[in-house]
Amino acid sequence: KMYWGDLHNHCNITYGHGDMRDAFEAAKGQLDFVSVTPHAMWPDIPGADDPRLKWVIDYHTGAFKRLREGGYEKYVKMTNEYNKEGEFLTFVGYEAHSMEHGDHVALNYDLDAPLVECTSIEDWKQKAKGHKVFITPHHMGYQGGYRGYNWKCFTEGDITPFVEMYSRHGLAESDQGDYPYLHDMGPRQWEGTIQYGLELG
């Protein structure tokens, strides 16, 4: 049997659009599983010395603060509320940005999974060892060093069993194919594709 789901959906609990309950309701009406995914951290956020970027930093860090001041507990509670074994599965997850490693999403098997603080994506993966969690790269095709995926840091195994090729950002698997990236982080690049990663071994 084939199952359909969305492992990386956003809402306005941090920065995104739409109410969290609406996100779960929409998913429940058409999917078998979902993770509504708050943005949780950006350990290497740039621009602290550039006053032009203060609004960007405040936008992100303000959302992270809201998540830690009750938002995460509300999110976990609603994720559990919508989880119906055998009917509709929900997963607790969250996203971390990284200039060096690229953005990643955590998907937890544990419906009461805590928000794990980290200093980098690699630190996050180390802290996740021994837990039932996937940490997978997101929008891989952006420029390396600016939140595009860094294949040199790929760790194959239980923690990263898959990578994301398509998202709202567009198609990551080609720098010339359909669905170009829509965000302001630049065009796609070949070095973010799965084929490039496979060629590295």
Where in this protein do the model-derived segments appear?
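Extended, charged catalytic domains and RNA/DNA-binding interfaces, predominantly
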Residues: K1-G201
